[in-house]
C-alpha cells in the first residue's frame, strides 16, 4: 500500500490515526528553519512511530499519538 503523503496541517489528527491503524504509512511534509522535511508516521504491533530527520519517537497509547500530532503541528487544529 502506498503511503499517504500530506502537508502539515492538511488533515485532522483522527484522519491521520485512522490511516495509520488501517496499515498505511503517512508522510508529513513540514517546514522547519526554512527548509522542507518529511516525517514518516507508522503503526506497528500496537506502537505508533514518528520518524523525524533527527530522531524516532514512539507512542504506546493512541491518546499520546494524537497529542503528538497536534503538538508538532502535523495535524490540523
Residue ranges and their predicted role:
Residues 1-32:
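Negatively charged, low-complexity tracts enriched in Asp/Glu with abundant Ser/Thr
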Residues 31-54, 72:
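Short aromatic-glycine-(Arg/Gly/Cys) micro-motifs in beta-strand/loop hairpins
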Residues 53, 59-74:
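A short, charged, amphipathic alpha-helix used as a generic interaction element across diverse proteins
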